[in-house]
Structures are given as structure tokens and as C-alpha cells.
Amino acid sequence: LRLSLYFPISISLSLSLEAMASFIATTTPAMPAFASVLDPKIPTKPEPKTETPKPKDDLERFRTSEVVLERKAKGFWRRKWNPRDIQNAVTLLVLHALAAMAPFYFSWDAFWISFILLGFASGVLGITLCFHRCLTHGGFKLPKLVEYFFAYCGSLALQGDPMEWVSNHRYHHQFVDTERDVHSPTQGFWFCHIGWVLDKDLFVEKRGGRRNNVNDLKKQAFYRFLQKTYMYHQLALIALLYYVGGFPYIVWGMGFRLVFMFHSTFAINSVCHKWGGRPWNTGDLSTNNMFVALCAFGEGWHNNHHAFEQSARHGLEWWEIDVTWYVIRTLQAIGLATNVKLPTEAQKQKLKAKSA
């Protein structure tokens, strides 16, 4: 009895639904999708294409490489730390502790010799002038003895030997603001500021640990020597500072100096890819930040730098203070810096931002 009742009811119901669907499709243009659910055979008009909403954040808006942007998975602290990461973390903690002692061990000779003089030699002559604008980008040339002396000074900044530093920065420009960037902002502000220093496995993961973009430096015995003996020079400097001025020289020379230079350099990777102006259409996240420029000897004019990577001058306007450029200009005046590269007016007009 149940079966005899079921079949007539189901047949009549399906016929009723089919008739209803045909009626809706032919009489109500606004409801073809509903009709197609009732009867898939009924053709429906394709839905009009809607424009993809513009991304809200700069990370998507300034995609500059074929590499897909991906955010680093959480778990930075819970991951397995390799010995070098642990060593770097302990070193950073010790140096920050020394820097915090600086007010209690202040003396004018420690301030001027360990911080100002040694900071200028390692920070300006070493990192920004030699490592960055000369070795990485070839913005100018120096006599080999002068280049090697400045490179040695840069090694005392504890930011890596010349080959490691230059390799990281060349990769940064090659894969700027993508997951293959050594300190990509796609990984978050903390990571691109200092976290990348504590995650060496990431370099191995992304590039197999290869530094095949510094063959020009690998060919030179001096840079291979600095790479192999890098830590010995740091220990020698500590011994020299202690011999000359005791513990206050250690506090100001190995604590305050290095921490100040660390965060000045790291701010270029983090702050200057987040806050500031973009007068040039570089297609990336680089910005000009005056505060960072003052702390990092002119390196904070980072959008200028990404627009004209080989330019020896980063502060392109008269009011953009660029201490490193003033030193390069002085070296050029006395004949030590040659083949100094600057952007042409044609290059500037090509990259000038519309809003600038």
C-alpha cells in the first residue's frame, strides 16, 4: 500500500516542480538560478563577472616577483633551534645587557673612542660605504688597499663577514618583498627587523644555503680570509678595548655601539618597508624615512635606493641628509673614490611617482 501511494505522489511532485521551474525561468528573469536548482536542464544566463576587490594591504599591492607571497607559518619560538641561532640569540641578549649598562659606565673617552670613532669606522666606512654602496651595488670604486681596510672595519660591526652581508643584500634586491627575500616584510615586522637573524635554517630552506651571488668576492683571498677568521677579529677587538679603557670601553664599544648599529640597520629592513614616503615607482614596499636616515647615516632614503640601486648617493634632495654620501664625495674630491654613479634626470623622470 505504501509503495502504491509513493510512486504516484513522487511522479506528480516531480512534474509539479518541473512545471514550476519552467514557469519561473520564463516569467521571472531575476530567478533563473533558482529555476536551475529545480531542474538542471533549464539553461541559465551566466552571472556577470564582478571585479576582484583591490587588496587592502601593501603586501599584495606591491607584488614584484613571480614568487608567490606566503606568510611564514607561526611557531618561531617553538621550532627546533640550530646551534648558530642559539649562539646569535645569546650574543644579542648579552650585547643588549651591556648597552643597558652604558649610563652607569659613562666617560667621555669611552663615548668618543668606543662609540663615536669606532662607530664611524665600522658603521659608515665599513657597512654603509663599503659593504653596501661599494661591494654590493658597485656605486663607486676604491683602491684595493682602501677597500680592504674599509671592509675590515665593516667586519667589526658584527653584522657578518663581507661575503655573507653582500650576499644577503643582493638576494634582498633580487627577490624584494617576497618570501625568498632574506628579511621579507611578508613574514611580519618582527621577523624582518631581527627575527631573520635568529632563523638561519630559513636561508638554507629557500636557497639551499648557497651564496652563489658573490663570486666576485669569493675570488679574492682577503674576503675568504675574513670569512674564515671572522670571530677572531671580534675577540681581538674586545681584548684591545679592555686593555685600553677597561670595562667602560667594552660597554660602549661592544654594547652600546653594536646595539645602536644593529637596530639602525635592521630598521631599514623593517621600518623602511612600512612607514614613510614613496616618491618613486619602484614596485615594492621601500619607503623614505628621515628618522632612519639620520640614525643609519643616510640609508633611510630607502625608496631612493630601490629606485636607483647603483647610485652612490641615497639622499637625492639637498635636504635629505646622507652622511655616507658626504664621505664618498670627500673621497672623490681627493681622488680615492672613482667611477661614482648617480641617477640621470632621464632615469628620475621615468620612475617619478605621480603623487610626488
From Swiss-Prot:
EC nos: 1.14.19.10
Residue intervals passing through the bilayer: 5-25, 88-108, 111-131, 236-256
Region (Disordered): 38-58
Coiled-coil blocks: none
Cross-referenced InterPro entries: Acyl-CoA_DS, FA_desaturase_dom
A Pfam match: FA_desaturase
EC class of the enzyme, as a word: oxidoreductase
Cofactors named for this entry: Fe(2+)
Family assignment from sequence similarity: Belongs to the fatty acid desaturase type 1 family.
Entry comment, domain topic: The histidine box domains may contain the active site and/or be involved in metal ion binding.
Protein name (Swiss-Prot/TrEMBL): Icosanoyl-CoA 5-desaturase
